[in-house]
Amino acid sequence: MIEVSSMERVYQCLRCGLTFRTKKQLIRHLVNTEKVNPLSIDYYYQSFSVSLKDVNKII
């Protein structure tokens, strides 16, 4: 079993599939690149936890 401390949350844009390490990076991408209305941002991404050893493979 993987310990919680060895997990990192990542965020994925549902419009283009890009993955980001921070929610701030994702929001900046959605507003500036994808032109998403800031009031509806929650519908355009998903977040999930990955083990630290796999983070660099994903991003």
Curated annotation (Swiss-Prot):
This is Putative zinc finger protein ORF59a. InterPro entries: Znf_C2H2_sf (IPR036236), Znf_C2H2_type (IPR013087). A zinc finger (C2H2-type) spans 11-33. GO terms for molecular function: zinc ion binding. Transmembrane segments: none annotated. Keywords: Metal-binding, Zinc, Zinc-finger.
